[in-house]
């Protein structure tokens, strides 16, 4: 009897560790699978052309990314340098504009995978807890915006290795330089990424305000903010865009952004699962999570097959706000867990230890089931989006290569996007439809597809004219149509 207790305790602790390890492996595996799927889906279905991506891709093809738009958003230089500029250089060297667009899509959608690889390499925490949270964040947040080429995708990808480097880079000149480069890259991904930069420095505060790593990060932050302000002053946006950017900034944190079908579905799934689990845990405590998950899968199946008529498309743009708001929360939890495991906290954090112990003892399986339910929602909604995008792109191609015409739009070679079936127009992005129509027609459209109610115009007449007259790899026909369109409005 004297040995039974310790042996039983050992088996119990082993079981707890095993369940926690399974949850960890599930999160890591799912995050990595998503990061690979982003690249595969984007390239197979040409998602680099969706929404603003059509304009960015066209700018790459005609080798004018900076002149077309990026000089207006100088605070997002990281995206320009890491994806658009290399693609534009490739077009210049290869003479193949279509291949250049593929290079842009590849580099942009590789960011989540590259971010996870960088985080794994930089993370020195016990159990690589920062890397685990990075995978969790990638799996739960990135599918919300996947497909829309928001610069916050890159910001999210850079945040995690930047967090790991800030906590674990050696206090040497080389280590400080690495922290500076990572925080600078993050800050110049998007204006919203400044929130993530501040968050990283804040996660170091629990080490103590006199801790060398905190002081290093704070000093680097001051330098990064100074550089960001200097660039904004030196390279201001055009007058046309200044007002547009100001209005966009004012609505960035509007709570109405989250009142969309995908967010409601995710919260309803969690709430439904949680409620069913609590009820069944009294009847079958060991398998309540399985039964609750099975019931929710059945409910979701009924919803998707018979009740659902939504497409998570345009809201992918607005949900970039979720990355700004939720990513720092995941980052803070990761940093606290890492510092607790390394015993680097300046003060005891008993509630954190108790929460982690509770997760290991009782919540690993229920959390795993909840995680997979959310993943199921993301998988289905992503599949619906990709399928609808494929049909919409085909419809635009038909118009761009056809003979239908709407001269009232300003030219006999213009055709209205309203000719597209209404159920497909949910994938439309009115300001970039003309650029999409040129690309899908292999840069030689017989018609320029235009949204007649569009009120946002990317190019001025002068910019479009200069590009048309320049020597470019793209045939002049498509560039001429866009020049006419631009000169009619700007």
Mark where each language-model region is.
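Signature aromatic-anchored transmembrane alpha helix within multi-pass, membrane-resident enzymes
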Residues: 222, 285-298, 339-379
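Start-transfer (signal-anchor) and selected internal transmembrane alpha helices
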Residues: 1-38, 341, 347-348, 353-367
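Structural signal for the C-terminal ends of transmembrane alpha-helices
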Residues: 44, 119-126, 161-171, 202-212, ...
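Transmembrane catalytic cores of multi-pass membrane glycosyltransferases
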Residues: 37-112, 142-152, 184-321, 385-395
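Membrane-embedded, lumen/periplasm-facing catalytic core of multi-pass transferases
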Residues: 370-489
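Short hydrophobic alpha-helices at membrane interfaces in multi-pass membrane enzymes
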Residues: 128-136, 155-185, 215-219
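Hydrophobic/aromatic-rich transmembrane helices and adjacent perimembrane loops
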Residues: 265-269, 311-350
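Transmembrane-helix motifs of polytopic, lipid-linked glycan transferases
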Residues: 106-131
């Amino acid at each position: 009897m004297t040995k039974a207790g310790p042996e039983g305790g050992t088996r119990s602790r082993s079981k707890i560790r095993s369940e926690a390890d399974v949850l960890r492996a599930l999160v890591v595996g799912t995050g990595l699978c998503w990061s690979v799927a982003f690249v595969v889906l984007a390239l197979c279905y040409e998602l680099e052309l969706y929404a603003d991506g059509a304009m960015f891709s066209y700018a790459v093809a005609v080798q004018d990314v900076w002149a077309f738009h990026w000089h207006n958003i100088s605070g997002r230089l990281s995206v320009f340098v890491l994806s658009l500029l290399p693609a534009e250089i490739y077009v210049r060297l290869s003479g193949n504009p279509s291949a250049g667009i593929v290079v842009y899509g590849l580099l942009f959608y590789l960011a989540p995978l590259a971010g996870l690889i960088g985080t794994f390499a930089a993370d020195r925490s016990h159990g690589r807890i920062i890397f685990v949270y990075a995978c969790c964040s990638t799996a739960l947040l990135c599918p919300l915006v996947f497909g829309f080429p928001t610069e916050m995708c890159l910001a999210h990808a850079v945040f995690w290795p930047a967090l790991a480097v800030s906590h674990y880079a050696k206090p040497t000149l080389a280590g400080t330089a690495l922290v500076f480069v990572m925080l600078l890259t993050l800050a110049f991904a998007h204006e919203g990424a400044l929130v993530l930069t501040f968050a990283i420095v804040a996660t170091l505060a629990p080490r103590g305000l006199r801790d060398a790593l905190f002081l290093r990060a704070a000093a680097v932050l001051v330098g990064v903010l100074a550089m960001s302000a200097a660039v904004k002053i030196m390279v201001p946006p055009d007058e046309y865009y200044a007002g547009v950017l100001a209005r966009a900034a004012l609505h960035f944190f509007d709570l109405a952004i989250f009142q969309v079908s995908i967010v409601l579905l995710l919260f309803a799934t969690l709430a439904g699962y949680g409620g069913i689990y609590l009820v069944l845990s009294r009847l079958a405590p060991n398998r309540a999570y399985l039964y609750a998950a099975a019931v929710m899968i059945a409910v979701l199946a009924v919803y998707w097959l018979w009740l659902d008529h939504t497409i998570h498309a345009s809201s992918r743009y607005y949900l970039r706000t979720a990355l700004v708001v939720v990513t720092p929360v995941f980052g803070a939890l990761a940093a606290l867990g890492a510092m607790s495991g390394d015993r680097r906290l300046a003060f005891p954090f008993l509630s954190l230890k108790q929460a982690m112990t509770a997760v290991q003892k009782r919540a690993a399986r229920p959390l795993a089931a909840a995680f997979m339910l959310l993943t199921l929602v993301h998988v289905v909604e992503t599949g619906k989006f990709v399928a609808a995008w494929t049909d919409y792109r085909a419809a635009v191609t038909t118009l761009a290569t056809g003979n239908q015409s709407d001269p009232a739009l300003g030219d006999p070679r213009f055709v209205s996007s309203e000719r597209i079936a209404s159920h497909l127009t949910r994938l439309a992005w009115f300001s970039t439809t003309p650029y999409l129509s040129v690309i899908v027609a292999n840069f030689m459209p017989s018609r320029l597809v235009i949204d007649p109610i569009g009120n946002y115009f990317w190019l001025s007449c002068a910019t479009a004219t200069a590009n048309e007259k320049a020597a470019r790899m793209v045939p002049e026909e498509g560039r001429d149509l866009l020049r006419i369109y631009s000169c009619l409005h700007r």
